[in-house]
Amino acid sequence: MSVGLSLVVAWVMTVSASFSGATEQDLWYRITIRDAPCGYLHETVRESPTRIRTESLEHLRIDRGGTVVVLSQGTTFEEDPRGTPLFATVRIDTGGRPVRHEYDFPEGLPRNRSPESGMQPVREDAGDGWLTPSEVRAFLKARIAAGATRVTYRTLDPYAGMRPLRIELTYVGSERREVLGRTLELGRWRMQSDGSSIPVEELRTAEGILVSSVADVGLGMMTVELVDRETALQALDAPPPELLDATLVPIRNMVGRTDDAVTAGYRVFFETDRPWELPDSGSQHVRTLRSGGFEVTIDAASGSPASAKELADPALLSASAYIDIDDPGVRRFFRELESTPGDTTLEACDRLRVAVARHVSNKTFGVAFGSASDALRSRSGDCTEHAVLLAAGFRLAGLPARIATGLVHAPASGFEHGAFAWHMWTQVLIDGVWWDFDATRKNRFDAGHLLVSTSSLDGGTGERALSEMLLLLGRMRVEVICVDGLVLDEKTTDGRGDGR
């Protein structure tokens, strides 16, 4: 989930650091997680007679189970002095081939210019009611100067395919603090958006410049603090925080391993302000409980019907930045795999799964999120690389496929009954039915999985899904009811104890 962390940092900065009253700015921020410096963000604004250019660049170093991963991403946004949007770019580097999205704005609507997007408007719902970066800066400065205690507006989220994002800031007080050698009176604001259930506490100058931002991102407290350039860059030299253990979901009752388990029952509870729903898809069937949680039944030997919308979704067969089926090497790899006459489609798909598992022979956390072609060439990766390469094989076979994100049960040091770890696998559509395939496990699929979301990974949907998953870290509870008929919890299905 390291790329999800990177995207949450980017989201915080999308709705925070771009606020400034200056026409020219050069701001450096240090990023810390659990008090450990781990990266920086650099934002600049440059003006010419015809254009205003806002740029941000972020670098992070984190430890994933003893492997240090370096992540970087950045955005640019160009507009004219009247606030007319002209051009924007998003670049994400998670250890594989960098992903780049380019947008223009015909008739004010963002359009993805990447080849796989088909040059179509990506957000018909954006409309005219959103603000560009320079408009946000001017709007916030004016509202603060007017003594406003609540500020609300809409902008575009570049890390979610230019999805409209509603921001609300509430004034909660003031404090004096030394900032870059000067003592300033700062406003304390609480920021929330419709894209996240995580509240962010901010300090801002009277001109709207962000001085600090603090949020509990599930892995611990994350702080983004205005500093000088040297201090910001030094954050990359410090020992990075170890984050893998913080993503584990403990369980108090479970069989030793679930690799061969076919059926299981769970209760799942979300401890968030925002309501969450679990998908009823593939091997997973969900029932809402009166207590507000969910009863989840897994039958790894079964699938579930697709909706009419899913059956008609062209993105499930198309090339994307991560599932790059237009790559010659990827096409050649799957074309040269031997087929077995008489195989059913399900059996043929499982042969693709085994081929991917064997090819990605270097199981490593060193790549946060590589593409299918990255996984093919490097033969390295974790669950994400296995999932996208297998999805590419399915799509090249003419079968709609998507990425599943959720939890998988696995042994974990310090956890008597193992733990659930965040995970990715692949779903494929066969004769109108979704089937689950996990190229990192011994069998096609097993009952040690819990599905939280699915994504075609087209445009910005993959990044959005990953960042949303991070919002659940530390806010999700799982209880095991039974595995392969063995009852492990005698509570009623509502989790309220024996009701007899």
Could you describe each region identified by the protein language model?
Residues G129:
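Hydrophobic ligand-binding cavity/cleft-lining segments
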Residues L186-R188, S196, E202, H386-R475:
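Hydrophobic/aromatic-rich core segments of domains that either
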Residues T132, A138-L140:
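Catalytic-site/binding-pocket detector for metal-dependent nucleotidyl cyclases
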Residues V136-R137, S302-G381, L389, D458, ...:
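Secondary-structure boundary elements
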Residues T149, P158-A160, R358-S413, W422:
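Flexible, glycine-rich surface segments
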Residues G4-S16:
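Bacterial N-terminal signal peptides
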Residues S18-E116, E124-A126, K141-G303, N443, ...:
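Acidic, serine/threonine-rich low-complexity disordered tracts
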